[in-house]
Amino acid sequence: MILFAGDPHGSYDHIYPFIKEQENVALIILGDLQLTTSDELDKLAKHCDIWFIHGNHDSKTISAFDSIWGSEWQSRNLHNRVVDIQGTRIAGLGGVFRGQIWMPPNRPMFFDPIHYCQYSPQEKIWRGGVPLRHRTSIFPSDIEILENQQADVLICHEAPKPHPMGFQVINDLAMKMGVKLVFHGHHHENFTYRTKYPYKITNVGFRSLADAEGNYLLQTIDDREK
């Protein structure tokens, strides 16, 4: 059984009732894990097979970044690859578009992280690469890596069209990869799009859960203080 989890933002208690009552669950988190240590993933892993993509909040602090990329859990990040999970080919596009790198449909400022570093002053370089913030920025190279591969499902943090804040480049990627389902997080609502595209799009909202067909198992409203 595959479950898709919307942005947890550091809280995972809502997931346990669903992974404890089922056997052989693969849990796929759609970004914004917002961890301070990797302990929470270690606890979840006792009950399910964990996969994820990163979101914009996963490079907001060094601790959030290191909880993923400084731990063994970085191997479970689906970003920029296709992995067979329980017989389903799942492609991952983590992160968000940012104007300093690329804000489609505008032309990109940089093609990939190496290009960014070549034209950046030394004080902007962090740990030998792009700044912490841009470790979760989408570069054109990320799309290029995926677009010549095939998958059944595309997961992303950013939304495709027709979301008002969605990006056509994600729709184009889904078409090239031949997927039948797209799941995304980032925007905290829960809804399934009705579109002309030959694939189903599901927005899995804040601390919510959906099954592999895009049916909601848990819908949560983000009532945190702004």
UniProtKB/Swiss-Prot annotation:
Coiled coil: none annotated. One of its GO terms (molecular function) is hydrolase activity. Transmembrane segments: none annotated. Gene3D superfamilies: 3.60.21.10. It holds the Pfam family Metallophos. This is Uncharacterized protein HI_0762. It comes from Haemophilus influenzae (strain ATCC 51907 / DSM 11121 / KW20 / Rd).
